[in-house]
A protein has these predicted regions:
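Accessory nucleic-acid engagement/destabilization modules that flank
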Residues: 1-119
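Conserved pre-motif I regulatory segment
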Residues: 124-158
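Walker A/P-loop
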Residues: 151-173
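Conserved strand-helix element at the start of the C-terminal RecA-like helicase core
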Residues: 184-195, 363-388, 395-396
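Inter-Walker segment of RecA-like/P-loop motor cores
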Residues: 208-256
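SF2 helicase catalytic motif II
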Residues: 249, 262-300
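Interdomain hinge/linker at the junction between the two RecA-like core domains of SF2 helicases
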Residues: 304, 310-363
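Conserved RecA-like helicase motor core of SF1/SF2 enzymes
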Residues: 399-403, 424-450
Length: 450
């Protein structure tokens, strides 16, 4: 089934049907040789201006490099067409063989986006606005909502840690999608710990789980009914849900992997809003591919891309830069960043691992919550064992723990920290670097191994 934005002219409709027939069972019997020849002549006439548009995307002065970029864009266009053909073939086959079809969402998604945006705005209105940080987060969120009135393209959300990027980007995406009738909103994050946290926030502020699909390795939908499992499998294969929450790896696979399952999802990016959290984690060796694909998606496929990070990479000054300078959703203001400076960093010097329990207990004498971040799992396990006898409640976090164990430990840790100071024991968390991956939790003091 062809979805909107997969073709820019109705003349491609019969061509897509012909391609689908050729892909699955040879030339259609109802099409004469003259009709097929006519379709291909029309396709050639339509491709000429498209090739001119692709050539115009190049940012290279050198003709050879410009030709290489254009060839890459043509490859992405071919991938998009193949994705649409595969999706139609697989979806129809699943419907015929199993009698299961994914939910059908309307072409005009604006009422759905507007309804979810109203739900979110109501929840945001209940937020406290007492402290300078509360007011700064509100300013960031309001600025993002105002910026959503702009056209599509590439946007940059560069705000300090703790500035409320998840909610601000969600508010931007819903507002923008409601104005431009975007097909779907795709949220990505580089690490599963960040993704789990963001998914919880997004579900809470959307208020309708039927619109949301999570696609990552932490999921095991074993408690669902068999019919729902088949439905989820189809949604995952095609990314046809209105809101997709996935990893950066899955997004990059969708753009570059040669696997048929990845190619099938590529067409779902058309006309969407893609929010890429912690964009600085894109590997340096992939920046050329990443930038060129962002150019293609934003300029040819009508995709709006939001690059989120507190430490933005300079994607416009590499060998193959972004074609357009990203639009900053929040202007850089030193006063705004100063509000979020809540730490005082001190160099504690050198110490042996065996001496650290004494240092930790000394730090606890002036606070009642402490985080110790170790470089290795072995260091964290060793220190945790030594602190078991201390008069405090001690927690251990490590990437070696299974996801459910780590999630339960984080919940217990958060519950301990939420208790009033007068009613709780002193709390110590000994962790590997896993806790630095965007985990939303606060301590009075932190000891970080160098």
């Amino acid at each position: 089934k062809k979805k909107k934005n997969e073709a820019e002219s109705p003349r491609l409709d019969p061509l897509m049907r012909a391609l689908k027939a050729l892909h699955s069972a040879g030339a259609p019997e109802t099409m004469t040789e003259e009709e097929l020849e006519h379709l291909f002549r029309d396709a050639i006439r339509e491709m000429t201006p498209m090739l001119d548009r692709l050539a115009a995307l190049s940012t290279q002065a050198d003709n050879n490099e410009a030709d290489r970029e254009t060839a890459f864009y043509i490859g992405l266009l071919a991938r998009m067409l193949l994705s649409a053909v595969i999706e139609g073939d697989r979806a129809d086959t699943a419907a015929f063989m199993d009698g299961v079809e994914p939910p059908v969402f309307p072409e005009d998604m604006r009422p759905i986006w507007a309804e979810r945006l109203a739900f979110m705005e109501k929840k945001l209105a209940a937020f406290p606005r007492k402290t300078p940080i509360d007011l700064a987060r509100q300013t960031i969120s309001d600025t993002c909502a105002a910026g959503a009135a702009g056209s599509g393209g590439v946007y940059r959300l560069n705000v300090p840690t703790g500035g409320g990027k998840t909610l601000a980007s969600l508010r931007f995406a819903l507002t923008h999608a409601a104005k431009r009738n975007c097909s779907r909103i795709i949220f990505t994050a580089p690490l599963l710990s960040i993704l789990d946290q963001n998914a919880h926030v997004i579900r809470d502020y959307m208020g309708d789980d039927t619109l949301i699909l999570e696609h990552h390795s932490n999921l095991a939908e074993t408690k669902e009914a068999p019919e729902r499992l088949q439905e989820l499998e189809l949604l995952t294969a095609s990314w046809s849900a209105p809101i997709i929450i996935t990893t950066l790896v899955q997004l990059l696979n969708t753009c570059f992997s040669g696997r048929t399952s990845a190619i099938r999802r590529f067409h779902a990016l058309c006309g969407s809003v893609i929010v890429i959290d912690e964009v600085q984690t894109v590997p340096g060796k992939m920046l050329t591919l990443f930038n060129l694909t962002v150019n293609f998606l934003s300029e040819i496929c009508g995709v709006t891309i939001v690059l989120c990070s507190a430490t933005q990479p300079c994607l416009e000054v590499v060998d193959h830069p972004l074609r357009r300078q990203p639009v900053d959703l929040v202007p850089q203001q030193k006063a705004l960043w100063d509000i979020f400076k809540r730490t005082d960093i001190q160099n504690a010097g050198c110490a042996r691992l065996e001496e650290l329990p004494q240092i930790v207990m000394g730090a606890l004498s002036s606070c009642d919550s402490l985080l110790v971040v170790c470089n290795t799992k072995k260091e964290a396990a060793f220190l945790f064992e030594l602190l078991q006898a201390a008069n405090c409640r001690c927690f251990h976090l490590s990437a070696a723990m299974c996801v459910q164990h780590r999630r339960e430990t984080l919940q217990a840790l958060q519950s301990a920290l939420d208790k009033p100071s007068a009613d709780r024991q002193r709390v110590v968390c000994v962790s590997t670097q896993v806790i630095e991956a965007g985990v939303d939790i606060s301590f009075q003091r932190v000891i970080r191994f160098s």
